[in-house]
Each structure stands twice: as structure tokens, then as C-alpha cells.
Amino acid sequence: MSNKKVVEAYIDGFNKSDHAEILACLTDNVIWEMPGLFYLEGKEEFDKEIENDAFVGSPIVTIIRLVEEGDIVVAEGHVKSKMKNGGLLDAMFCDLFHFENGKIKQLTGYLMHNKQQ
């Protein structure tokens, strides 16, 4: 499976709230960073963050563009998700995936809230 296909499976896991599908795409020592927001290491910490109780139901994640070069995939996309406080997350993202042996070893994500509503 190409690295792009792994990212597509990872995103599909979020759209279905399928933790097993998401975690299967990751190395055991995965690093997830959103600069200025958080830095996590390991599948257990990753799983806790995707179980974030501020949100309700599955998000809707749409990929706009995937670019692959060597062991790196860049994903540009849009995410919407209902929040428990009644709000809506509506944001654009750019995620940088580093791969090792066909799995995501590091994810650096940048998120910008959509103000054009």
C-alpha cells in the first residue's frame, strides 16, 4: 500500500470513528504534534487524544490534496465536527506525515478555523 493510501485509510478511520483503523496506520512510537497546542508520543496517548470528549459523533474530514514525496505525505483538507458545547469545529488543515516501514511515524498538523461562514 502506498503512503498516500495509508493516509486515506487513516482519514477514513476518523470519518467512521474507527480507532482500530486509525491506530493500525501508526508506528507504536508515533509522535503527533500541533505546534503551540500539544505534543504526544505513542499510540496510547494518540488514542486518548482522538477520544477527545469535547466533540460529539464522527467528524467529517475531506481531503482536498495529497502530495507524496519519498517517506513524506502532505494532506490539505477540511474538517467539521459538532462539539458538546453546541459549537461547531469548522477548520482547514495541513498535515505533514512522516513514514517508516509503511506506517505513520510522525504527524505534524496545522489547523486554521474557517471564519467564512
Q: PLM features: what roles do these ranges have?
A:
Residues 1-20, 24-28:
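Short, low-complexity N-terminal intrinsically disordered segments enriched in polar/charged residues
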Residues 31-40:
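A short gly/proline-enriched turn/hairpin at secondary-structure junctions
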Residues 2, 15, 33, 47-117:
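A beta-strand edge to alpha-helix "cap/lid" segment located at domain peripheries
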